[in-house]
């Protein structure tokens, strides 16, 4: 058993001088599982399954760059003094909202170039994106980041958590709220909901917008528990502001697209 105070080594293994970090392995695993899910669904919706391979070849590196840039921007007071740390993403410090912005922008351009509906691609990808986020939070677990306020061990035990989670939440002599776990479970629940909503045959675009709303609601409340949030002011957490904006924007888009006739097609339509 991993003893309290002895965290899991963030380095999974060495390849000569190269250190392979669990963080990268977990993020990569989430991306691959999400890609597999999207490829399976794309064939059912009249698209070639390799369309998502082409998309992720652009979307993943751009999303990672945007996620890191977003984080660095709001922590510039530190990175301006330590510029060599900017590229060290294996230590953590990538923001999901930044990655989402990069992925959406890439998807819009990609869909225009390929002559495919962006909303069709986004609907198919929505459960995959959320699955990747759910898995990716375990990279934060290994790095002992994205945690909440200090708590007692007895509190963590009252949640019936396995010992390996409780022990990994022991950081510098104190136990912490496993907020990474709360967000991961919220995201896994969202994947199930989105997969069920596929059967309802929603209007095109609404599945993706439902993902945005679901994720943002969970992120808003869980972010309030974290101690390492990016801050806009001393009292205002950036992720909470962005979450509110995304919820409002998604609802407006649902209504606007319906009123203007832009959402007449359904999820299951193959054209």
From Swiss-Prot:
Pathway annotation: Protein modification; lipoprotein biosynthesis (diacylglyceryl transfer)
Main location: membrane
Membrane topology, record value: Multi-pass membrane protein
Transmembrane segments: 18-38, 51-71, 89-109, 115-135, 177-197, 205-225, 236-256
Listed EC numbers: 2.5.1.145
EC category name: transferase
Subcellular localization: Cell membrane
Coiled-coil region list: none
Gene Ontology molecular-function annotations: phosphatidylglycerol-prolipoprotein diacylglyceryl transferase activity
Residues involved in a 1,2-diacyl-sn-glycero-3-phospho-(1'-sn-glycerol) binding: 137
GO biological process: lipoprotein biosynthetic process
GO CC term, one of those recorded: plasma membrane
A matching Pfam family: LGT
Source species, domain of life: Bacteria
Keywords carried by this UniProt record: Cell membrane, Membrane, Transferase, Transmembrane, Transmembrane helix
Similarity comment text for this entry: Belongs to the Lgt family.
Known role: Catalyzes the transfer of the diacylglyceryl group from phosphatidylglycerol to the sulfhydryl group of the N-terminal cysteine of a prolipoprotein, the first step in the formation of mature lipoproteins.
PANTHER family: PHOSPHATIDYLGLYCEROL--PROLIPOPROTEIN DIACYLGLYCERYL TRANSFERASE (PTHR30589:SF0), PROLIPOPROTEIN DIACYLGLYCERYL TRANSFERASE (PTHR30589)
Identification of the protein by name: Phosphatidylglycerol--prolipoprotein diacylglyceryl transferase
């Amino acid at each position: 058993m991993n003893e309290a105070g002895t965290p899991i080594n963030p380095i999974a293994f060495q390849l000569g001088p190269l250190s392979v970090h669990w963080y990268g392995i977990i993020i990569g695993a989430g991306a691959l599982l999400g890609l597999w899910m999207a490829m399976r669904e794309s064939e059912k919706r009249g698209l070639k399954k390799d369309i998502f391979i082409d998309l992720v070849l652009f979307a993943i590196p751009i999303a990672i760059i945007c996620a890191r840039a977003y984080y660095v921007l709001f922590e510039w007071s530190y990175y301006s003094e330590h510029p060599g740390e900017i590229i060290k993403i294996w230590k953590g410090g990538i923001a999901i909202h930044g990655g989402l912005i990069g992925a959406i922008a890439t998807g819009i351009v990609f869909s225009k170039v390929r002559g495919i509906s962006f909303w069709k691609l986004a609907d198919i990808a929505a459960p995959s994106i959320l699955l990747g986020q759910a898995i990716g939070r375990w990279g934060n677990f290994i790095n002992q980041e994205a945690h909440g306020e200090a708590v007692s061990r007895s509190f963590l035990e009252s949640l019936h958590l396995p010992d390996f989670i409780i022990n990994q939440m022991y950081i510098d002599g104190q136990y912490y709220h496993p907020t990474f776990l709360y967000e991961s479970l919220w995201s896994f629940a969202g994947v199930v909901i989105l997969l069920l909503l596929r059967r309802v045959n929603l209007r095109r675009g609404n599945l993706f917008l439902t993902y945005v709303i679901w994720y943002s609601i969970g992120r808003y409340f869980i972010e309030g528990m974290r101690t390492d949030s990016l801050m806009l002011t001393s009292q205002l957490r950036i992720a909470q502001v962005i979450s509110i904006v995304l919820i409002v924007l998604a609802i407006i888009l649902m209504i606007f697209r319906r009123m203007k006739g832009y959402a007449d097609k359904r999820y299951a339509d193959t054209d």
